[in-house]
């Protein structure tokens, strides 16, 4: 009896496990590409629902519910494709169509020929042609401006020619000019002083005074017992020191 019960329980458990085990999972559906354009990359990602493993011991109802959830989770598993946008295909530049060379037009030099004939028949004015060429030429104008500026900016002391250049050079003038230049370079010599003339007679000093008007006064003391008078110097201004000397020099001049 114990063996039979054990076998029946094993068979029932095996039957429940066989009923709980689902069939094989469905194959993922791969989308078919319509255009044969190669894609730059595919992102193959699975999004399974994480289920924590639980032990098998428990009631048969719980085992059956767990098996159904596993089968539903397996059915919900699918492959997801994330397609990046296709890269723009660079169009290769088409080869340029060879163009035909332009052909010369008939009678294209007719106007030039007429101008040449008119120039040949007209009178040639050399002065006018030179003036026009000088006015149009940039190099000639620049050269003239440089020469004019050099002539205007040179100081008079450095000018080479002060007068017109003559072919008939006078020898005496050239030699005299060279001699003057050499003498100007020599150091100045000490000159002898000029002889002085003998001085003339001096002026008469009695012109400024009259001898008849000169008087001399002296004190006359009649009282006895007075002390004798002492002479006292009277101060004079300092500018009168050389007054007589300056007066004599002025008279000599």
UniProtKB/Swiss-Prot annotation:
- Which branch of life, at top level? Eukaryota
Basic residues biased stretches? 59-80
Record's subcellular location: Cytoplasm, Cytoskeleton, Microtubule organizing center, Centrosome; Cytoplasm, Cytoskeleton, Microtubule organizing center, Centrosome, Centriole
Q: Which GO terms describe its biological process?
A: notochord morphogenesis; positive regulation of centriole elongation; positive regulation of cilium assembly
Substitution effect: residue 79 to A = Does not affect centriole localization. Does not affect interaction with RTTN
| UniProt KW keywords | Cytoplasm, Cytoskeleton, Phosphoprotein, Protein phosphatase inhibitor
Q: What does the UniProt record report as the effect of altering residue 45 to A in this chain?
A: Does not affect centrosome localization. Does not affect interaction with RTTN
Q: Which residues carry this modification: Phosphoserine?
A: 47, 52
Family as reported in the entry's similarity comment: Belongs to the PPP1R35 family.
Protein name according to UniProt: Protein phosphatase 1 regulatory subunit 35
Q: Which species?
A: Homo sapiens
What is this protein's gene name?
PPP1R35
């Amino acid at each position: 009896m114990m063996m039979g019960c054990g076998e029946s329980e094993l068979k029932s458990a095996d039957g429940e496990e066989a009923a709980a085990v689902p069939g094989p999972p469905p194959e993922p559906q791969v989308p078919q590409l319509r255009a044969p354009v190669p894609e730059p990359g595919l992102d193959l990602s699975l999004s399974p629902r994480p289920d924590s493993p639980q032990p098998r011991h428990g009631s048969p109802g719980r085992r059956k519910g767990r098996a159904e959830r596993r089968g539903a989770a397996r059915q919900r598993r699918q492959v997801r494709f994330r397609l990046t946008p296709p890269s723009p295909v660079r169009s290769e530049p088409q080869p340029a169509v060879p163009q035909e060379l332009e052909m010369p037009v008939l009678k294209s030099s007719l106007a030039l020929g007429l101008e040449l004939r008119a120039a040949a028949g007209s009178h040639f004015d050399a002065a006018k042609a030179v003036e026009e060429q000088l006015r149009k030429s940039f190099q000639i104008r620049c050269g003239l401006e440089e020469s004019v500026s050099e002539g205007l900016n040179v100081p008079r002391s450095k000018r080479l020619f002060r007068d017109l250049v003559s072919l008939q050079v006078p020898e005496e003038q050239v030699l005299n000019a060279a001699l003057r230049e050499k003498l100007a370079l020599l150091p100045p010599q000490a000159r002898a002083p000029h002889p002085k003339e003998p001085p003339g007679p001096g002026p008469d000093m009695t012109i400024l005074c009259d001898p008849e008007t000169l008087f001399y006064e002296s004190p006359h003391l009649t009282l006895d017992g007075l002390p004798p008078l002492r002479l006292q110097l009277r101060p004079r201004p300092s500018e009168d020191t050389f007054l007589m000397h300056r007066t004599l020099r002025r008279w000599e001049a």
